[in-house]
């Protein structure tokens, strides 16, 4: 796992086609682990998302899945964007496109539908590196327009992923649902 120097290990990202590679995958969150072991493959089979595995050498150390999404921003959230009161600052919108951008009622996005790091590989900056890889994937994809990356960050008593995503420049896209298990976050791509 560690080569004795400060060079982070190479992360190899590929489409996940062999779900048996996940047979011993555990991220340490029981609900997510159960989902990965029993229902993740069904989500993929029913075209909900495209799965990716992340390897260091020959070991799956993380997985994520992506699907298309849209960001609907209420006016007060647009005001926050205009003022730069988000984790990612003011969007890089040209002056000629500004009126068009702010008049939209929804914006194209790619959602991180699932994201998990193998328990023994957590706290090694792999998650942050993967978020940046996902941002680059979203920027490079050429199937449709994409201005944001979104995620429903898992949050329950005793565990919340919101802090991790905020460190990765995500901001709240909606107020938290007091009875829900997730909080919707977004990050501007440009």
Predicted regions and their residues:
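Short hydrophobic/aromatic beta-strand element in the GNAT-like acyltransferase core
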Residues: 49-53, 63, 109, 114, ...
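Conserved active-site alpha-helix within GNAT-family acetyltransferase domains
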Residues: 144-146, 151-175
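Short glycine/proline-centered loop/turn elements that form peptide/ligand docking sites
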Residues: 131, 157-161, 175-185
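Conserved glycine-rich acetyl-CoA-binding loop
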Residues: 105, 118-129, 157
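Short amphipathic alpha-helix that is part of the acyltransferase structural core
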Residues: 2-42, 46, 51-53
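Conserved beta-hairpin
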Residues: 48-67, 73
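Conserved acetyl-CoA-binding loop-helix of GNAT-fold acetyltransferases
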Residues: 123-137, 167
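Conserved acyl-donor/pantetheine-binding loop and adjacent beta-alpha core of acyl/acetyltransferases
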Residues: 65-114
């Amino acid at each position: 796992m560690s080569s004795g120097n400060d060079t982070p290990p190479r992360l190899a990202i590929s489409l996940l086609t062999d779900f048996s590679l996940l047979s011993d995958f555990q991220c340490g969150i029981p609900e997510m682990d159960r989902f990965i072991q029993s229902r993740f493959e069904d989500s993929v089979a029913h075209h909900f998302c495209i799965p990716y595995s992340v390897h260091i050498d020959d070991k799956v150390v993380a997985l994520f899945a992506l699907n298309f999404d849209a960001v609907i921003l209420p006016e007060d959230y647009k005001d926050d964007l205009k003022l730069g009161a988000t984790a990612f600052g003011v969007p890089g919108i040209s002056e000629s496109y500004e009126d068009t951008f702010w008049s939209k009622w929804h914006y194209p996005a790619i959602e991180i539908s699932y994201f998990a790091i193998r328990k023994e590989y957590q706290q090694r900056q792999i998650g942050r590196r993967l978020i940046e890889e996902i941002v680059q994937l979203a920027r490079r994809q050429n199937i449709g327009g994409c201005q944001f990356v979104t995620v429903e960050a898992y949050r329950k008593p005793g565990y919340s992923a919101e802090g991790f995503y905020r460190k990765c420049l995500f901001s709240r896209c909606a107020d938290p649902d007091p009875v829900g298990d997730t909080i919707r976050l977004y990050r501007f791509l440009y």
